[in-house]
Amino acid sequence: MALSGGDDQVPPGGPMTVSTRLIDAGSTIMQRRLPVKQMNTHVSTFAIYGGDMSRLIGTHHYVHRVNDEFLQCAVYASDRSDAPLIGIEYVISDRLYETLSEDEQKLWHSHAYEVKSGSWAYPRLPEVVAAPELKNIAKTYGKFWCTWQIDRGDKLPMGAPELMMSPQGVGQGVLRPELVKRRDEKYNISTDDLKHTRAEIAEPEWINPMADYWKQHGKCFVLDIATVEMNRHAQFP
């Protein structure tokens, strides 16, 4: 069973030189970083590897709200300034989810349990402030690709991305108490209290059975890397 908060992962490489520090300092002053500046919200939650559900990790989503029905998140292993970037997650409304093909829907997970169980938390943000957003998130679906498996000790991003699943209240989707306790102590919160506070949040009337595919069908999706012939002919519009 793998439990990871990602606080001790440092990739190999030499220290920054004076010249690289100057480049960074100059870029900070002279360049515009508009996409990054749109990441306004920090979410602490958990995820499970779709191909190996014994591996549960803590994640830190930094959220860019593109509009009221589409969020895009940079996912880090911790909230430190040197935290490894371990993946990306896209979050869409239930309305947008229903426009997807069934094959595409299978790659997404629901968020209702994450919200209701208290595992989806906004560190340092009062629950009363987060409440309206939680009601919306409970009805959304997410697609999370992990690109760096630091919980298995990878010092660099290795192999193909892994499709991640959302914790659920059954089977191998149950949250591990050790990891929840570590998160709660770090942010001085109580997941159990959050669960109690959110009891009045309405669950979706219907969660599409194509989502949380492992839970509904006992199967998962993994990527493999294969060598193929290059397409040497340009495609005309």
From Swiss-Prot:
UniProt-recorded name of the protein: Oil body-associated protein 2C
InterPro entries with a match to the protein in the record: OBAP-like
Family of this protein: Belongs to the OBAP family.
Domain of life: Eukaryota
UniProt xrefs under PANTHER family: OIL BODY-ASSOCIATED PROTEIN 2C, PTHR31360
Organism: Arabidopsis thaliana (Mouse-ear cress)
Pfam family, one: DUF1264
Coiled-coil features, chain-numbered ranges: none
Phylogenetic classification of the source organism: Eukaryota, Viridiplantae, Streptophyta, Embryophyta, Tracheophyta
